Swiss-Prot record:
Organism encoding this protein: Homo sapiens (Human)
Tissue expression as described in the entry: Cerebellum and testis.
Keyword tRNA processing belongs to the record: no
Domain of life: Eukaryota
Protein name per the record: Putative endogenous retrovirus group K member 11-1 Env polyprotein
Job of this protein: Retroviral envelope proteins mediate receptor recognition and membrane fusion during early infection. Endogenous envelope proteins may have kept, lost or modified their original function during evolution.
Subcellular location: Virion
Length: 191
């Protein structure tokens, strides 16, 4: 996984599932989803989810590639017209309580957990990403094309069994900016 001073985002299909920093600038093109000037190609960075990692020292922000979680054909069907979004229903296997040692194969998986999305990377261990309340908003900073303003809300809900869950994924043609006065992104990097 990226170190504390990582400043790049996934730029090759083989890097899918790599967390990258959104606060320090970029080694590769800035994160843009869809077709826009200076963006990562659609075939490489199909969509992304903004998640919050819970640390004892404070709140940190990062993005996780969704390339391995969403088939490319699903995104291609929604490229023209309304901005597509994907929502995972709170069903599926429960998150494991005990974790095996690292393996030679990189495998990402998802599972249902209270107020969290869990991405399992068997090559490096398990990473648990806690999703914040708030929303993302399109910005015009990526330039090129017609700008369509849109807001993507991330919120919790309870299912019939009163288990709070969250699974929200989305795609956008433009750069996304996190907006929540209670969330502070630290520029020092990721751990």
């Amino acid at each position: 996984m990226p170190g504390a001073i990582d400043d790049h985002c996934p730029a090759q299909p083989g890097e899918e599932g790599t967390a990258f920093n959104v606060t320090m600038g970029y080694k590769y093109p800035p994160l843009c989803l869809g077709h826009a000037t200076r963006c990562i190609h659609l075939e490489t960075q199909v969509w992304a989810a903004y998640l919050l990692e819970r640390l004892a020292t404070g709140k940190w922000g990062h993005l996780v590639s969704g390339l391995s979680l969403c088939p490319l054909r699903q995104m291609k069907r929604g490229v023209i017209g309304d901005t597509p979004y994907f929502q995972y229903k709170p069903v599926g296997k429960l998150c494991p309580k005990n974790f095996e040692g690292p393996s030679k194969t990189l495998i990402w998986g998802d599972c249902v957990n209270s107020h969290a999305v869990v991405l399992k990377n068997d090559s490096y261990a398990l990473v648990i990403d806690w999703a914040p309340k708030g929303y993302l908003k399109n910005t015009c900073s990526s330039g090129g094309g017609e700008f369509l303003e849109a807001t993507y809300f991330i919120s919790y809900w309870e299912d019939e069994d009163h288990h709070p869950t969250l699974h929200r994924w989305f795609g956008s043609f433009f750069t996304l900016k996190w907006e929540d006065k209670d969330i502070t992104l630290h520029p020092q990097g990721l751990v």
